[in-house]
């Protein structure tokens, strides 16, 4: 079994078993199942793991913020709203992570105003990337705190230039003072505003607000 060590495990709140080996994680999961339904099942099988349990997550989210005068993108530290800048997450799809890195660079170059949850002011709140594992289609969702998105046409054009593999780009508008990532309104900026993927022979349409 291949093992890698996450450099963010002591600060990031996304992975609760990041300090254990993958083998230990599988054992712990089996023990959890046994503790819940063991009295009903005599023979609980071992958990089936992956040979390479990394870069498998095809829904990748990052929140934007500022560290001093620098724009950062990452995830919240556990139990806080302190953003931990993430450059290379070991469980996120590598292609999605690269797109988020590019979006962060473009935010800086286009001087997009980052949303401040304390003051309720600013434009860009989050970025979400979804990837169809069978179709390889990619959706980028830019979550803004208002309908206005300065330089959006040039922003989208440059993002597509750097990542021609992107299928669709959507602006999601979340004007609420809430910890919820997505709002209810979606505005396609490029493409159809959704992607499709195939699972068990069935084709599904995936929107920004899908599971």
Predicted feature descriptions by range:
Residues 1-211:
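Accessory RNA-recognition modules of RNA-modification enzymes
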């Amino acid at each position: 079994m291949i093992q890698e060590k996450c450099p963010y495990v002591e600060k990031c709140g996304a992975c609760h078993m990041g300090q254990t080996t993958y083998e230990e994680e599988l054992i712990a999961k089996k023990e959890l199942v046994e503790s819940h339904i063991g009295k009903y099942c005599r023979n609980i099988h071992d958990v089936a793991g992956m040979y390479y349990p990394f870069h498998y997550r095809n829904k990748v989210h990052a929140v934007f913020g500022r560290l001093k005068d620098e724009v950062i993108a990452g995830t919240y530290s556990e139990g806080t709203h302190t953003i931990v800048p993430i450059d290379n997450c070991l469980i996120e799809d590598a292609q999605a992570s690269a797109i988020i890195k590019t979006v962060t660079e473009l935010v800086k170059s286009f001087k997009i105003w980052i949303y401040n949850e304390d003051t309720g002011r600013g434009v860009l709140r989050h970025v979400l990337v979804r990837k169809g594992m069978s179709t390889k289609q990619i959706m980028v969702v830019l979550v803004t705190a208002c309908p206005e998105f300065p330089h959006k046409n040039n922003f989208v054009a440059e993002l597509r230039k750097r990542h021609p593999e992107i299928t669709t780009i959507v602006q999601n508008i979340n004007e609420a003072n809430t910890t919820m990532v997505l709002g209810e309104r979606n505005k396609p900026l490029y493409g159809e505003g959704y992607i499709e993927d195939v699972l068990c022979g069935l084709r599904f349409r995936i929107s920004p607000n899908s599971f």
